[in-house]
């Protein structure tokens, strides 16, 4: 319920030491619970693939965020990319579609390679990034982490995490 979600968000105000970052992973689509947590966050990152269903889900989420919560800044990560160039093409296509109808700012954050190493890390529940590896997966995640800070903050006027 809305009250339960509000209590969860406000419970973070009581932490003695505030975290520098907190990632909140919500399900695809514009469900009420997802929207409440997104509106309570400073920065929003949407993960897409090159598939039409992914574009539809992401567009729906961004449209609801924009129209109902006045959020207009979004970082975009392209998952399962066959190459950095293909990821950028997918982003450009999604941005073109989205900005045709919505006045939103989409920032390309980067891509997650479609690789066996990523799939194996998911199956084994082990990190794909290691300080000793200099592979395409590590490079991609390092790029993502450096660009996350560049996403513009949303000012929604709703309750926020760590809002005391």
Question: What is each PLM-predicted segment?
Answer:
Residues 7, 17, 21, 26-110, ...:
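Conserved catalytic-core segment of NTP-binding enzymes
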Residues 97, 101, 115, 151:
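Phosphate/oxyanion-binding loops and surfaces in catalytic or ligand/nucleic-acid-binding neighborhoods
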Residues 10-17, 117, 143, 147:
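Alpha-helical scaffold segments in soluble metabolic enzymes
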Residues 3, 89, 136-139:
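Conserved active-site and cofactor/substrate-binding residues in soluble primary-metabolism enzymes
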Residues 102-129, 141:
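Beta-strand-loop-alpha "switch" segments that mediate conformational coupling across diverse proteins
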Residues 123-164:
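NTP-binding/hydrolysis catalytic cores, primarily Walker-type P-loop NTPases
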Residues 1-17, 122-124:
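P-loop/Walker-type NTP enzyme "switch/lid" segment
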